[in-house]
Amino acid sequence: MAAARKQNTRKRRVKKNIEAGIAHIRSTFNNTIVTITDVHGNAISWSSAGALGFRGSRKSTPFAAQMAAETAAKGSIEHGLKTLEVTVKGPGSGREAAIRALQAAGLEVTAIRDVTPVPHNGCRPPKRRRV
């Protein structure tokens, strides 16, 4: 009586043929997250400095942001992406490095938009650091 073994099936990733997309770069003081979506907002590929193995203060470097953008760009090029609009959010150090890495990966950047949320004097900010 051999037990019926369950076939280990994984859903195959469908190659979408998408020409244009949007790169959402969220650059905080601690990390940089790059998500590439189609024009409707459906994610094609994403990457972050932390997901690539950068830990601690190395996550917030421009080099880590560059690597994250390259990884996300490679994943989106596999789906046929050619042109990008870039939206950048946050005050982090990896903003420009991530945009340059997307261009260097072979994607044509058509527009760069800064969508950093600015409060109309909302929450009290954290106290000033004394080093």
Curated annotation (Swiss-Prot):
> What keywords appear on the UniProt entry?
Ribonucleoprotein, Ribosomal protein, RNA-binding, rRNA-binding
Source organism lineage?
A: Bacteria, Bacillati, Bacillota, Bacilli, Bacillales
The record ties this protein, via SUPFAM superfamilies, to: Translational machinery components
The name under which this protein is listed is: Small ribosomal subunit protein uS11
Q: What does this protein do?
A: Located on the platform of the 30S subunit, it bridges several disparate RNA helices of the 16S rRNA. Forms part of the Shine-Dalgarno cleft in the 70S ribosome.
Is-annotated flag, keyword Chaperone? Answer: no
GO molecular function terms listed in the Swiss-Prot or TrEMBL record: rRNA binding; structural constituent of ribosome
This protein's superkingdom? Answer: Bacteria
**Which InterPro entries did the record assign?**
Ribosomal_uS11, Ribosomal_uS11_bac-type, Ribosomal_uS11_CS, Ribosomal_uS11_sf
- Oligomer and partners: Part of the 30S ribosomal subunit. Interacts with proteins S7 and S18. Binds to IF-3.
Record's signal peptide: none
Q: Give the transmembrane region(s).
A: none
Q: Which family does it belong to?
A: Belongs to the universal ribosomal protein uS11 family.
Answer yes or no on keyword Magnesium: no
List the GO cellular component terms: ribonucleoprotein complex; ribosome
Give an example GO biological process.
translation
